Amino acid sequence: MGDVALTIPALLSVVESHPEIHITLITRPFFASFIPAHSRIKAVGINLENYKGLMGLRKLTKQLSNKHQIEEVIDLHNVLRSRTITSFFKLKGIKVTTFNKNRSAKKEIISHQSNEKLPHVTNQYLNTFAKAGYESKLMEGPWIKPETKPQLTEFLSQNNLNSKEAKWIGIAPFAGHEAKIWGIEKIKNLISELTAKNYSVFLFGGGNSEIEQLNDLENKENKVFSVAGKFHFHQELALMKKLNYLVCMDSSNMHFATLVGTPVVSIWGATTPLIGFYPLNNEHLMVQVSEKNKNKLTLSSYGNKESENGYDWRNEIAVKRVLELLS
């Protein structure tokens, strides 16, 4: 989901710089729902279950050609399915430009053979558009501007949160893989330190297991609120926008908070920002192990590999380091 979210600043920047073009973004239905409304950007949600196999993708290409005035295709995904679709468009004589995933460079970074940082993924997307002839400068954020609806307004009112007496800190303690997660005990300690400062704390997550754990941490008397599973996605974004900071792992929440303009303190373990998926314009708030210990990390692109040498990065990242960035 994060890679789709990071197309948003690129798409907005391109249409801002090139008023002559219209963009149709083909993606999954849920992903289409968070693309900002724009007169020259149309997000089309496609259920890929309806287009299985080679013939299914050929059918999809035909339907897209018939329904939309496609004059050019830019593949920002560069996986087998998207390459198959673009091949069908090429057969129709349509120009195709493909995103370079820098697979070799990523492999060298992950295996500790290189420390050369890749450009941010959003800038890589912009480079792809530039290669197609649409050079653009990254426009300033925020890139998503969610409105506060009655559901969120009522929640804030019921919990006496209509005004800020002290900072509002969001915490999104989970990620897609365990090896990227700082740990619930660290989160508990962080919450204790924040509530001692009279800060309000908002806990973000999703899925039954995460919701259950966050509900256990909720303490309304101390202004610790679990919002997991309580709001529609866009209202979660509206709440994120109101925060002073979001503390998170390498996860989609990291990117969405950045897109709404909230400073992000990100904690890194089994992945590395060097491959370009760090929070845009928030590099100064990244928390990592020391330079001397980075080679001890067991890294992967997705953070799905546990330590292979017994080194646990969590032990090195103290609560105090995170607190210092929130002050």
What are these regions (language model features)?
Residues M1-S327:
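Catalytic machinery of carbohydrate-active enzymes
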